[in-house]
């Protein structure tokens, strides 16, 4: 049976950035590295733009997974940061789950590396506990397309909604009249073609 449309609500959503670590990022091959980095930072920017509670977590930083990428540390200097000693599934870490539940939000926007493990495991666990889960596919990465689609199939069959960061931003925003300049600036910073669109729009507007 098809699940009813559950719309993202900026007043009931939190962002979970899972295991965007230097070592793990070297494994991402299903999307170009520069595009992937841009998408992750775009998700971070939209989380800040909409004032969404955001949680960072890493696993086994002292091992080959490596440290959290510095760009995310700089983007979120004061956000909860859970360095898991070894738990593969972030939901198995008590501090992480406490931080998630402390947000008071029921909609979880999740992205991470690698998709079929670091994203899928906590997403499936959260669904089991009654959360609505939205997986940001283009801010999550893995080894290859086969692995990616296997993860997406498992997640969607369990009830997760698969989205892109652009779709997340638009659904949270709801109405262009809320703040066209602010959201358009966010898009322009991460989508070159959108920057061209806004440049054209600004030029035409000034001519009127």
Curated annotation (Swiss-Prot):
Major enzyme class: lyase
Keywords annotated in UniProt: Hydrolase, Lyase
Catalytic site: 118
Alphabetical list of InterPro entries matching this protein: Hydrolase_YcaC-like, Isochorismatase-like_dom, Isochorismatase-like_sf, YcaC
Top-rank lineage group of the source organism: Bacteria
Gene3D superfamilies named in the record: Isochorismatase-like (3.40.50.850)
Subunit structure: Homooctamer composed of two tetrameric rings.
Name by which UniProt lists this protein: Probable hydrolase YcaC
Organism: Escherichia coli (strain K12)
Lineage of the species this protein comes from: Bacteria, Pseudomonadati, Pseudomonadota, Gammaproteobacteria, Enterobacterales
Gene encoding the protein: ycaC
